[in-house]
Amino acid sequence: RRVLFRSMIAVMDENGNQIHGNCKPTSELPMHTETYTIRDDIGGVVHCHPPYLTAYALANKDVETRAYPEMMGNFCKFECAPYGRPGTDKILAGAIPILQNKRDIVLLGNHGVLVVGKTVTDAMNKTEAAEAIAKALFLTAQLGGEVPLSDEECQFFLDLQKTK
């Protein structure tokens, strides 16, 4: 495992010119830059491959629950977009409608996850929360599956999410 230093982060301007960092930008830079144009409230983008969210992405499975109030109240569900080849405009194509539907977390089929927020820190915090939720749900499945809450209780948390 390598240590990430500030000098290793490729910082780009709005024209795609590198203004900081000594590492080459990712081949997925167009995905990052185009994501900012999808919604006015997007001010930060995180794309990564955390193990549990990536496992769901590799299985092309949405992450959803009827048992975990914290997920229902904060995120509703994490939808999985169809596969698109990394490094091409196809990787974002399936995620665009999900992001346009005010979802902040999108699994990229057979690849990883794309998370947006008001800032990069906000997007990173959502990424960490989403990975913890995916891990809990994955482990719950290993124990025989979740015990769902009542329809009324689920609706309470889904309504709570709509007010955020």
Language-model features: locations:
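Glycine-rich flexible loops
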Residues: 1-164
